[in-house]
């Protein structure tokens, strides 16, 4: 099998690359490890895209300029990302939504609500599944070949340049030759053995929010072949999910957004982090690592009646009780310790106008750890509780790329091997996360990689 461009992966970044290469008139094959009904990688579960814009649009409110976007990114990652790639990502994010719409992707009208995202993020109508269906429909119309249940088991590289790949599909092995290739196969979060190398036994208690097919095979092939690594094996997008979620592929409905509205305690009934440190889209992805550091990698969110209706609930019902003590017992927590924690928290709360849309003045004083915003006493029945575990979305260890999205092999950018999406996200994300930026990385670098591969295949 011979093509101009081979794209490995089947999510947003991969399809953006495939469509961009096809736009340039190249023959393209997409090698998707998942079966057809599971196609799309983690993009199946996405909801929105973060993008800079200078004025309100049909799908975004207000303005979100490049400098503010960059400031937000630096705030969550400590300014450790590749500065040139970060700036380019933000500048090119302006083009993403119109380009997606050309391929049948539809967006919701601008939304307002508790997620603080109406100004910064455009939401997909129908979510990630509709997004990926639109892309695959466009790929079919344009004559892009797609191999499902197909895993790249080896790459034939010559001095850092791509020549061919051996792909296992349907119990057979095929060799795909291509003049250029794009690797967009995600991270290794579904590979529990690899996670244990970084996290130890704690990884056994992680829940994988997305696809079970991101086991890092192509990433390992590239690193073993001399690709320059970027990022840390422990760095990842990880949030707090309902502990009752399935081990794989639970998606957005297992996420818990109630943490800023209450308190979070560990198995000993003790608080361990500031639940109100920052607005939720800039803070939610820190909670997975925080919970992972607790005994048994488990925690519990406690809220009272004042919070009910203010957050998107888990797909699983809350534990409900008429008192804090009874709630602690229902959650198998030490009731005296939980009661003392709640009493200390309530005594430390300083009243102010409550506003979940801003960094309000509702805070604690003299409490460690503090709650910096949205602190209200837990004093109104019924009381709700949710068990939490770390929910990993994707890992940040990946391959280094240049500004053309070429993989840096043995210190030199490859002439025809590109990477996009989570497999190279560590160039931009070293720590933390901004809601929707994963889709931005996939779209911007997917398009860039596809166009670059098309040029290399001339």
What positions do the PLM features span?
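Extreme N-terminal leader/targeting segments of oxidoreductases
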Residues: 1-5, 23, 432
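An anion/pyrophosphate-binding glycine-rich loop and adjacent beta-alpha core
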Residues: 219-221, 225-339
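A glycine-rich dinucleotide-binding beta-alpha-beta segment and adjacent secondary-structure elements
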Residues: 337, 341-431
């Amino acid at each position: 099998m011979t093509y101009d461009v081979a794209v490995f992966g089947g999510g947003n970044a991969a399809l953006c690359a495939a469509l961009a290469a096809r736009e340039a008139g190249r023959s393209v094959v997409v090698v998707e490890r998942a079966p057809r009904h599971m196609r799309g990688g983690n993009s199946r579960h996405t909801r929105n895209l973060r993008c800079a814009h200078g004025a309100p649009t049909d799908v975004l409110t207000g303005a979100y300029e490049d400098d503010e976007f960059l400031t937000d990114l630096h705030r969550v990652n400590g300014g450790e990302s590749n500065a040139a790639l970060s700036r380019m990502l933000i500048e090119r994010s302006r083009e993403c939504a119109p380009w997606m719409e050309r391929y049948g992707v539809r967006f919701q009208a601008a939304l307002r609500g508790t997620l603080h995202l109406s100004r910064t993020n455009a939401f997909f109508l129908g979510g990630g599944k509709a997004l990926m269906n639109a892309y695959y429909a466009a790929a079919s119309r344009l004559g892009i070949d797609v191999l499902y249940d197909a895993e790249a088991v080896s790459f034939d590289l010559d001095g850092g340049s791509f020549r061919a790949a051996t792909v296992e599909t349907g119990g057979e092995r095929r060799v795909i030759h291509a003049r250029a290739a794009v690797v967009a196969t995600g991270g290794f979060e579904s590979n529990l053995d690899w996670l244990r190398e970084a996290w130890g036994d704690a990884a056994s208690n992680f829940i994988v929010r997305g696809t079970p097919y991101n086991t890092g095979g192509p990433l390992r092939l590239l690193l073993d072949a001399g690709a320059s690594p970027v990022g840390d094996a422990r760095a990842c997008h990880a949030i707090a999910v309902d502990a009752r979620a399935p081990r794989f592929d639970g998606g957005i409905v297992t996420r818990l957004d109630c943490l800023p509205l209450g308190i979070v305690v560990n198995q000993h009934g003790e608080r361990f982090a500031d639940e109100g440190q920052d607005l939720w889209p800039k803070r939610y992805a820190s909670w997975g690592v925080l919970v992972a550091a607790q005994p048994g990698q488990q925690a519990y969110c406690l809220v009272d009646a004042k919070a009910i209706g203010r957050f998107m609930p888990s797909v699983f019902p809350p534990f409900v009780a008429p008192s804090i003590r009874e709630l602690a017992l229902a959650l198998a927590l030490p009731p005296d310790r939980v009661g003392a924690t709640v009493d200390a928290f309530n005594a430390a709360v300083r009243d102010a106008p409550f506003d979940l849309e801003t960094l309000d003045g509702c805070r604690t004083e003299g409490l460690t750890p503090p709650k910096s915003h949205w602190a209200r006493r837990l004093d109104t029945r019924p009381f709700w509780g949710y068990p939490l575990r770390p929910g990993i979305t994707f890992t940040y260890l990946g391959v280094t790329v240049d500004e053309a999205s070429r993989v840096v092999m043995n210190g030199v950018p490859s002439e025809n091997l590109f990477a996009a999406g989570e497999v190279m996200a560590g160039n931009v994300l070293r720590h933390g996360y901004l809601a929707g930026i994963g889709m931005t990385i996939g779209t911007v670098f997917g398009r860039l990689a596809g166009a670059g591969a098309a040029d290399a295949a001339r």
